[in-house]
């Protein structure tokens, strides 16, 4: 681990275009970013959209170590989204790419632009299941990840090969 680096988790999702390929490309773009090292991808999963219509999502989570400050990392995530044609038409709209900063080490961040830990991550199987692939012992404010997974077991999620 590099001194001054932080372990970061980012959720990735897409349900328009070649969704899985988009996620793989976005992960490679993140891995190639100065200040980001040791990027690991969870499995890919298929899930139905939350509170909207449209095609099923492909979701995963990435873990990496990072020396970028959180706001600079957020800028990079949003730039990658835009490179892939992300438009923010309305909440939960179908999207070519969605990158959400879930955890930035142990930091608690609450600014106009950024809330970390992500405020709804503990309610979403499409975040918790791939997150558990990478961090099966993770403890969140709402409880151990294994306990949180029990609360979302009614949400349909399918691992892709």
Describe the role of every protein-language-model region.
Residues 12-14, 66, 132:
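Short, structured patches in soluble enzyme cores that scaffold and shape functional sites
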Residues 2-36, 41-48:
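N-terminal beta1-alpha1 ligand-phosphate binding loop
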Residues 35, 49-58, 68-74, 79-161:
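Flexible, gly/pro- and Lys/Arg-enriched active-site loops
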């Amino acid at each position: 681990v590099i001194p001054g680096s932080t372990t970061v988790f980012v959720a990735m999702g897409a349900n328009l275009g070649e969704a899985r390929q988009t996620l793989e490309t976005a992960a490679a773009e993140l891995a190639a970013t100065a200040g980001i090292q040791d990027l690991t991808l969870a499995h890919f999963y298929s899930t139905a959209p939350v509170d909207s219509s449209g095609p099923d999502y492909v979701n995963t989570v990435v873990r990496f170590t990072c020396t970028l400050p959180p706001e600079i990392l957020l800028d990079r995530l949003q730039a990658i989204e835009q490179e892939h044609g992300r438009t923010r038409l309305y909440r939960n709209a179908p999207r070519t790419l969605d990158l959400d900063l879930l955890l930035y080490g142990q930091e608690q961040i609450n600014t106009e632009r950024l809330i970390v830990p992500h405020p709804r991550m503990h309610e979403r199987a499409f975040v918790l299941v791939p997150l558990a692939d990478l961090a099966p012992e993770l403890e969140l404010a709402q409880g151990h990840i294994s306990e949180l997974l029990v609360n979302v077991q009614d949400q349909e999620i399918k691992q892709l090969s």
